[in-house]
Every structure is written in structure tokens, then in C-alpha cells.
């Protein structure tokens, strides 16, 4: 009788220990996952969305939003210094992915090219991107557009060819790029001279847009990125590029493969959020931070809750 009781006690203890162990496993903190972004309003907004969604799913997260420039961010990801970043599909051509120019100008083909390359070469996974092209484009003020009937790159080319007054402000990397200004000139048949341009060593479009807005040094055309937050607030018009000259840059979460294998739920955690972010939405969100001075985390949280993506 005593032996039977002893066996029963031992069985119950085993069950209890097993249950406690399972509970500990189920409640264990997942992570930590280090999230990093570039230094801009869009990086801050999208990075905070990633942080909020992961924390809501029980992940411990290390915040490195505003980590650095694109090259610094990429090196940190490749060296396992960070786990999850926000990057842009068109950048794949600079990371080593080889494809024809037409591939990078196609949203789906460009995504597939960098996705395949990084997975096979670096064990880095590109997750679902947002349908918002943050590529290099040219913008004018709406008043300039209306006065000169310029809404497209075809219109702009005709204006230049007919001797219209032009002062373009842009970055050196854009002015010398066959898929930037050189590509635009070849595709649309116009030519700008050096005295029609102000070329900066950096790509800070906030400074360029301010020059356009103020008309500094006669600037009436500026390099912009498609989702720049100041475009709506500053009453700017982006010239339509019907020939898709520059590469398409869709923002996407990019995750180290080892982390994706350890936590496979991360592959789908951000899908609904990024699919909801079209060009106008990102412009509006960026404007609240870059132009309105709102806190990026609050903007991100309000958006996620409004869309039913966060409790």
C-alpha cells in the first residue's frame, strides 16, 4: 500500500514538474531582437511599427532606430550587429544582386531579385514590402506646374528644350547616375548644363526641398524621394515618370536568416501592416513627423490602432 502511494506521488510530481516546465517555456520571453533603421522620419515611423508589433507579440526588443546611414545599416546587418532593419528593394543592386536595369524598375521583379540574392548569398530574408515607391524623382511647386503646364517628365523635357529657365538642386550621386538624371535625360530627350544645376555632396532631400520652397538661388526643380513627408505640406508636385527610369525602392522589413529560423512567426508578423502602406499614406505619416514635429512612435502607434493592427 505504501509502495503504491509512493509511486503515485512520484507520478504526480513528474506531471507537476512537466507542467511547470511547459508553462515556463510558454511564458518565456522571445528575443531579444535588435531593430535598426536609417536616420530619417520614415525609418523612425516604420521602425516603431516593427517594435510595437513585436512587443505586442511577446518579443523583447532592443531599439536602435536612427542607427545610421544606409551603408552603415547594411554592414551592421551583415555582421549580425543588428537583427531586423527597414531597407529598400532597389538597393539590392548595390549589395551585389545582378539584374538588368529593367528588373530594378519593376516592383515585383526587383523585390524577387534582391530577395533571392540575399537569401542564397547572405542568409538574409526580405519580408513583404510596402507598395510605396520611395524612388528618386523630380518635383516642382504646384504654382510652377500650373504656370508652365508641367506635370510629367515629358512636359519638363519640352520645357527645357524650349529654353525654359531651370535650376535643379540634387545630389552628386543622382546627377552622375545612368539610372538617375543621366537616365532621365536619355529617356526623355533633354539636357541640363552645369549652370542649370546645384549639385550637393549628400542626399538630404529636406535641404533640397527647403531650397525649392524658398526659391533659393533660383531653384525651381528638386530631387525628392517619392514618400517624402514634406511634399504635401509644402504644396509640391512630383513629376510623373511614365518610363520608370530610376529603380523602384519599396520599403520592407529585412531579417537575419538565423532569427527567422528561430522565430518563423516573424516572417508574417508585419505583412498586413506593410501591405497597407501606399505612397499617399507614407507621405502623410512622414509629414506628421518631418513637418509637423510629432513623435514617430505615437504616429506609428495611432496608425496601427486605427487600422486594427494593434490592440
Predicted regions and their residues:
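Bacterial lipoprotein signal-peptidase II cleavage site
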Residues: 20-28
Amino acid at each position: 500500500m505504501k509502495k503504491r502511494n509512493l509511486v503515485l506521488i512520484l507520478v504526480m510530481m513528474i506531471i507537476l514538474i512537466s507542467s511547470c516546465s511547459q508553462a515556463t517555456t510558454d511564458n518565456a520571453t522571445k528575443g531579444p531582437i535588435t531593430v535598426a533603421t536609417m536616420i530619417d522620419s520614415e525609418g523612425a515611423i516604420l521602425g516603431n511599427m516593427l517594435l510595437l508589433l513585436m512587443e505586442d507579440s511577446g518579443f523583447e526588443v532592443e531599439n536602435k532606430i536612427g542607427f545610421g546611414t544606409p551603408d552603415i545599416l547594411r554592414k551592421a546587418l551583415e555582421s549580425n550587429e543588428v537583427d531586423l532593419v527597414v531597407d529598400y528593394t532597389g538597393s539590392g543592386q548595390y549589395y551585389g544582386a545582378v539584374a538588368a536595369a529593367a528588373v530594378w524598375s519593376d516592383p515585383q521583379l526587383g523585390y524577387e531579385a534582391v530577395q533571392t540574392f540575399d537569401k542564397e548569398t547572405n542568409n538574409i530574408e526580405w519580408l513583404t514590402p510596402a507598395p510605396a515607391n520611395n524612388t528618386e524623382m523630380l518635383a516642382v511647386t504646384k504654382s510652377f506646374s500650373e504656370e508652365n503646364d508641367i506635370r510629367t517628365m515629358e512636359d519638363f523635357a519640352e520645357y527645357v528644350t524650349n529654353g525654359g529657365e531651370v535650376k535643379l538642386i540634387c545630389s552628386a550621386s543622382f546627377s552622375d547616375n545612368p539610372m538617375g538624371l543621366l537616365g532621365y535625360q536619355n529617356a526623355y530627350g533633354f539636357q541640363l548644363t552645369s549652370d542649370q544645376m546645384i549639385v550637393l555632396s549628400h542626399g538630404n532631400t529636406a535641404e533640397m526641398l527647403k531650397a525649392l520652397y524658398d526659391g533659393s538661388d533660383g531653384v525651381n526643380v528638386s530631387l525628392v524621394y517619392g514618400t517624402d513627408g514634406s511634399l504635401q505640406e509644402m504644396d509640391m508636385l512630383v513629376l510623373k515618370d511614365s518610363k520608370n527610369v530610376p529603380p523602384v525602392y519599396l520599403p520592407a522589413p529585412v531579417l537575419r536568416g538565423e532569427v527567422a529560423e528561430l522565430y518563423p512567426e516573424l516572417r508574417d508578423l508585419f505583412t498586413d501592416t506593410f501591405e497597407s502602406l501606399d505612397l499617399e499614406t507614407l507621405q502623410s505619416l512622414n509629414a506628421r513627423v518631418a513637418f509637423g514635429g510629432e513623435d514617430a512612435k505615437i504616429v506609428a502607434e495611432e496608425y496601427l490602432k486605427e487600422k486594427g493592427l494593434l490592440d
